[in-house]
Amino acid sequence: MMLSRAKPAVGGESPHTDKRKKKGRKIPKLEDLLSQRDFTGAITLLEFKRHVGEQEDDTNLWIGYCAFHLGDYKRALEEYENATKEENCNPEVWVNLACTYFFLGMYKQAEAAGFKAPKSRLQNRLLFHLAHKFNDEKKLMNFHQNLQDIKEDQLSLASIHYMRSHYQEAIDIYKRILLDNREYLALNVYVALCYYKLDYYDVSQEVLAVYLQQIPDSTIALNLKACNHFRLYNGKAAEAELKSLMDNASSPFEFAKELIRHNLVVFRGGEGALQVLPPLVDVIPEARLNLVIYYLRQDDVQEAYNLIKDLEPTTPQEYILKGVVNAALGQEMGSRDHMKIAQQFFQLVGGSASECDTIPGRQCMASCFFLLKQFDDVLIYLNSFKSYFYNDDIFNFNYAQAKAATGNTSEGEEVFLLIQSEKLKNDYIYLSWLARCYIMNKKPRLAWELYLKMETSGESFSLLQLIANDCYKMGQFYYSAKAFDVLERLDPNPEYWEGKRGACVGIFQMILAGREPKETLREVLHLLRSTGNTQVEYIIRIMKKWAKENRVPI
């Protein structure tokens, strides 16, 4: 939601400007228009004077100043560049030109112009922000030391804190300035932004309301309110908040329109992502991340990886997303390297002082231990925020696996059955773990029914192997024999015959012990006859002899 760019934005048409209504025949003074922040009127007056030959010395500088404050940075750039070419160029123009380059995302040019300007508070603030953009910590600290305890410098510092995810530090500065300057209403929006980033959406709404009472049509404030509604309620509630902004098609704030289009994609669950997000990837920082999330939801892991592989993460969200993408790619490719990278990213976020007590931080630690297969530790973290995700299918999917992996198959089965997503319920990991839970919980018939519902595939073959072996270990020989029988038909591997033979003998022993109905013997004989092994006749002869002696129909 920050108004910053990551690529140059020159070229194209200037934003449309509204015509001013005439209030009389008296020509207003430039000073009056500037004091009223009527920058459109000021430009009109300056252009008129230029046209009739009444141009003053700094006309182009004032036009550049007004265009800059209207957000028309391309026009400001044109005026300032022309001013630098004049013979008696005012040296102050260089810092104004540098600021314009900065807002157009032309950071190298901004730095070059900034160093040509005479030393000033504004120049130091500009170079401070450029050092942050270039990730130059040494320069950042040098310019930081030059900041003074004046409002402009402190606001600049708060902005850097925000961009470095130091939200509480930014809040402290804004609140301190607000104590003595209640008229600085916009600071409430900045405070609300910080609370939003800290996941305090209700607090963000309360602070934002102070500003919206005075400025009810603020684009940025209404957009933030919509984002809070999205987090607190749902996408429809958020979209309703944006309706007034969408209806206001005449708004000259083009970047806000890009922001709204971006957020609508998020509010609508990714609808229109491929049409809206790609052009915004280097304009709105979150656009790249949301496009990566879209690709992940479409199971296009490779495309997600291509989009994020060169991103140097600087925020917890970026580290987390890189971790998720590497984990998904590692599972898809069977790559230990990608899994290791994912585990390190998760550990970095979850172990950080700023994130260790947040839900995302604990999710990261759970993910880290999950990849390390340390499921007791996984459960420690998952249990700490379980109450927030009772109906969340993804959470339940991971929680059930961890429960089952630690031997608590009873609760694992219960949680698996809470999952509603058909996509997850058809996933082999879900089917195999649920089958294992059924078997361990002495419900082998339900595990067998899971197999019967599957189409013939490599996954169904793997599930058969699981049922055959796990049922055998648990002494559930009937379903073990059935599974080994199908495996033997599909693949004449001697091991499958040995498994079936052992399971059939196991059933016979259970019949002898009175723990299995005698009628089951008929099906056991049928399973044995389907095998061409020489040992079959000897086993069948013994079983038939017993059946005859005990008058069991076969």
Curated annotation (Swiss-Prot):
One of its GO terms (cellular component) is ciliary basal body. Residues 1-27 are annotated as: Disordered. One of its GO terms (biological process) is axoneme assembly. It is found in: Cell projection, Cilium. Disruption phenotype: Partial embryonic lethality and patterning defects. Surviving mice show hopping gait, polydactyly, hydrocephalus, and male sterility. Impaired hedgehog signaling. Primary cilia are not reduced in number and their length is normal. Mice exhibit defective cilia structure, including abnormal positioning and number of ciliary microtubule doublets, abnormal localization of IFT complex B components and significantly reduced ciliary tip accumulation of proteins GLI2 and GLI3. High expression detected in testis. Detected also retina, kidney, lung and brain tissue. The expression level is low in spleen. Expressed in the developing liver. Present in the airway epithelial cells and the testes (at protein level). GO terms for molecular function: intraciliary transport particle B binding. TPR repeats lie at residues 57-90, 92-125, 151-184, 468-501. Keywords: Cell projection, Cilium, Protein transport, Repeat, TPR repeat, Transport. Residues 18-27 have a biased composition (Basic residues). The keyword Repeat applies. It comes from the Eukaryota. The keyword Protein transport applies. Component of the intraflagellar transport (IFT) complex B required for transport of proteins in the motile cilium. Required for transport of specific ciliary cargo proteins related to motility, while it is neither required for IFT complex B assembly or motion nor for cilium assembly. Required for efficient coupling between the accumulation of GLI2 and GLI3 at the ciliary tips and their dissociation from the negative regulator SUFU. Plays a key role in maintaining the integrity of the IFT complex B and the proper ciliary localization of the IFT complex B components. Belongs to the IFT56 family. Component of the IFT complex B. Interacts with IFT46; the interaction is direct. This is Intraflagellar transport protein 56. It comes from Mus musculus (Mouse). The lineage of its organism: Eukaryota, Metazoa, Chordata, Craniata, Vertebrata.
